UniProtKB/Swiss-Prot annotation:
The gene is wee2. Residues 469-495 form a coiled coil. It comes from the Eukaryota. ATP binds at I194, G195, V196, G197, E198, F199, G200, S201, V202, K217. Its EC number is 2.7.10.2. This is Wee1-like protein kinase 2. Pfam families: Pkinase (PF00069). It is found in: Nucleus. One of its GO terms (biological process) is regulation of meiosis I. It comes from Danio rerio. Belongs to the protein kinase superfamily. Ser/Thr protein kinase family. WEE1 subfamily.
Length: 532
């Protein structure tokens, strides 16, 4: 090695020794304190000290050049395995605040970004206000710390900034991987296509795990970013909020595959009311008056539950009312009342489905449904009495089941129905029931009965009262039979209790016989203990 190269190495080592010594002097001080204080810098040309050991002799060959810095001085430079590298120093210089201030700013940053970041879950717009307020109060309580003195001013600033923004943040779209297994194909066995609509198709499937039948609705086209995306999300939101009710189609789960929405619902083995009306019309038949009363009563119960939940359906029609042929009792769902606790003797249960047009009563975002069942006030964008629009559509649905001709989409006949005129029917209805249907089609929405009033109407309660009387008579006969059986058992027990006292006189007891327990072991029949 030449002496010029050795000089350059020596200068480099001196510069590195300067960086290391500055790190030792300023490692305990923050960058902001260093900027306000003048730190005396050592001379960059100072040669590093060399510690020589007396007991060590260093022999230097005159022909072979060696490093001017021994091993001990080289280790003192702290260039090996040192965390204080130039990169770490640079990262420290980019943070102008002290350690205590950094922790506070980081806590504020985490708190503010928690409100500003895009949510990882969807926000259900149909969630009741009480549940939403409780969740926000719990979130604020969990974010506050006992030793955080600046929480009050920060929370006010965050609250003011969050109120300016829209409450409903963008919906979360699930990431779909090409290697992801299809849940629909792995968990369900498709049997048949039972319906095709504007949104997509409905399939009758068997779940491989539990062996039960379900109705799986799948969107026809990818809905991500399309107009149908909001309709699909509305249906999922409404089903999730409503829960389980005997007159609303039950919801189980929903997921997305390849940007297609898939909804797992309850399977109704009787098909839709539209199918039943079409089948009867082809056979020259129509629904009888008791069947019409049962239809009107059960759908009114479902609408009552939906309206009491703060929602409106806005798409009531025969194709969205489904039939279960099996005989079921009222399952005690949420919102049940005394008029719902009945057994359907006909074995037919009507359920409201297809909640794609559901919206909130307090803050409506109306998507107009089928124009044949649309109330006139909704067409005029008067949303002050939205639940009465469902009542109007229910009246037209009952008229179709009674044998009315298909409803017009526009024209004079369409306007005559909105004026409260009933269409011609193939058979005469009772006067009271006919007046009830006229009230459902009243041009004034305030004059139409509510779903709760329909459930208690005298015309519908008479039919229900007859069913209840028959059921009560059956239950009374069963209770009479049980009472007779209990009386007979009680009489026999009394006779058995008095007979030993009459037959057993003093001195008339038979002699006790000896019984063998085991081998050659005698034991008395009496099991009394001495002293008792």
């Amino acid at each position: 090695m030449k002496w010029s190269e050795m000089a350059s190495v020596n200068a480099t080592q001196q510069h590195l020794n300067f960086s290391s010594s500055w790190e030792e002097d300023s490692s305990d001080n923050s960058f902001d304190e260093w900027t306000h204080k003048s730190v005396p810098l050592r001379s960059p040309c100072r040669t590093p000290r060399i510690q020589r050991h007396r007991n060590r002799s260093i022999t230097v060959s005159p022909s072979v050049p060696t490093s001017p810095i021994p091993y001990a001085a080289w280790k003192k430079l702290r260039l090996c395995d040192s965390p204080s590298t130039p990169k770490s120093l640079l990262s420290k210089s980019t943070m102008p605040c002290s350690s205590s201030k950094t922790c506070r700013s980081q806590r504020f940053l985490r708190l503010s970004t928690a409100f500003e970041r895009v949510p990882s879950v969807n926000i259900n717009p149909f969630t009741p206000d009480t549940v939403r307020r409780n969740s926000e109060h719990y979130k604020r309580k969990s974010q506050r710390s006992d030793d955080d003195e600046d929480y009050g001013p920060r929370s006010k600033e965050i609250q003011n900034s969050s109120e300016d923004e829209s409450f409903f943040l963008p919906s979360k779209r699930p990431a779909v991987s090409a290697r992801m297994l299809s849940r629909y194909e792995s968990e369900f066995l498709e049997l048949a296509c039972i319906g095709v609509g504007e949104f997509g198709s409905v399939y009758r499937c068997v779940k491989r795990l539990d062996g039960c039948m379900y109705a799986i609705k799948r969107s026809r086209r990818p809905i991500a970013g399309s107009a149908n995306e909001q309709l699909a999300l509305k249906e999922v939101y409404a089903h999730a909020v409503l829960g389980h009710h005997p007159h609303v189609v039950r919801y189980y789960s929903a997921w997305a595959e390849d940007d297609h929405m898939i909804i797992q619902n309850e399977y109704c083995d009787g098909g839709s009311l539209h199918d039943a009306i079409t089948e009867k019309r082809e056979q020259g038949e129509f629904f009888s008056v008791p069947e019409l009363r049962d239809l009107l009563l059960q759908v009114s119960m479902g609408l009552k539950y939906i309206h009491n939940s703060g929602l409106v359906h806005l798409d009531i029609k025969p194709s969205n009312i489904f039939i279960c042929r099996r005989s079921t009792l009222s399952a005690g769902g949420e919102g049940d009342s005394e008029e719902e606790d009945e057994s359907h003797s006909s074995g037919v249960v009507y359920k409201i489905g297809d909640l794609g047009h559901v919206t909130s009563i307090s803050s409506p975002q109306v998507e107009e449904g089928d124009s044949r069942f649309l109330a006139y006030e909704v067409l005029r964008e008067d949303y002050t009495h939205l639940p009465k629009a469902d009542i109007f559509a229910l009246g037209l649905t009952v008229l179709l089941a009674a044998g009315a001709s298909p409803l017009p989409q526009n024209g004079d006949d369409w306007h005559r129905l909105r004026q409260g005129e009933l269409p011609n029917l193939p058979h005469e209805l009772p006067a009271l029931f006919k007046d009830l249907l006229k009230s459902l089609l009243d041009p004034d929405p305030t004059a139409r009965p509510s779903a709760t009033a329909l459930c208690r109407h005298d015309v519908l309660c008479k039919e229900r009262a007859g069913k209840l009387a028959t059921q009560l008579r059956k239950e009374l006969n069963v209770e009479k039979f049980r009472t007779a059986m209990l009386e007979r058992e009680l009489k026999e027990a009394r006779l058995a209790a008095t007979s030993p006292q009459q037959s057993c006189q003093p001195g008339s007891l038979p002699k006790a016989k000896r019984k063998l327990v085991g081998r050659n072991v005698a034991r008395s029949v009496s099991f009394g203990f001495p002293g008792y």
